[in-house]
Amino acid sequence: MKIPLLPHTDHLLPKGRAKLTIAQARHIRMVKEALSSNEGFLMAMIDSNREESEITEVPALTTRVQIIDFHRLEGDLLGITVEGIDILRIMKIHVDFDHLLIADCAPYFIWPPFPATSENQYLADKLKQLHATVPDLGELYTEPKYSDMTWVCQRWIEVLPIDGKYKQLLIHQENPKLAIRFLMKLLQDKNLIY
């Protein structure tokens, strides 16, 4: 399947949500096509220290997103809210006539639901706390799934300021067990702000 690709510093995983500002004509075309086809588009993780002009590679795993809301902003900008649908593996990328990236991709597995336990409930509690502290983030989720560690871990992976290659390592796993261990260790570190 061929799907438009948007490299972005906002990292999004299945069931995650983000608000994006779309400015370039090629990306506005991407949004129009995503809305008319119901195929969505891909959001590929790039680290915040990389400029779009220097992107020569994107991670193999990327999230397909659907647009759940949009509105016009000042200055001919477009504001959209997207939600992650699934994970796809990029096989090949080509550049379209207007420099929009188009990816040939194949389905990849997504983590199954994974129930919270007394041992890992700490992660859900800290995420609730983060959502209360950062209302713009918390308001994106009208029905948060704090009892599902897959959902909780994916939200943490999206927001934590860790290198994209480590995020990719975590999402390459067949379930969230490694992510739970990693996040428990990271979030229980007293030097971490959260």
Regions found by a protein language model. Name each.
Residues M1-Y194:
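N-terminal low-complexity, acidic/polar interaction/targeting segments
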